Amino acid sequence: MARVCEICGKGKQNGHSVSHSNIKTKRSFNANLQNVKIEVNGSVKKALVCTKCIKGNKISKAK
């Protein structure tokens, strides 16, 4: 299972680490994903969801 948000599809992005002497090395920026129990069609399932979707009320948390 890939580290991708199941709601919006947000995943890993690539970029550079830049040192003081301006040397650039490749690095990756991971999305802030959390395991959350969500309610889908009346049933409860676990899903990897980014914090932006959690805070934006794009999911309904299971109680």
UniProtKB/Swiss-Prot annotation:
UniProt GO molecular function: structural constituent of ribosome
Record InterPro entries: Bacterial_rp_bL28, Ribosomal_bL28, Ribosomal_bL28/bL31-like_sf, Ribosomal_bL28_bact-type, Ribosomal_bL28_sf
Keywords, ordered alphabetically: Ribonucleoprotein, Ribosomal protein
Cellular component, GO annotation: ribonucleoprotein complex; ribosome
Top-level taxon of origin: Bacteria
Family matches, as NCBIfam families: L28
Name this protein carries in UniProt: Large ribosomal subunit protein bL28
Organism: Brachyspira hyodysenteriae (strain ATCC 49526 / WA1)
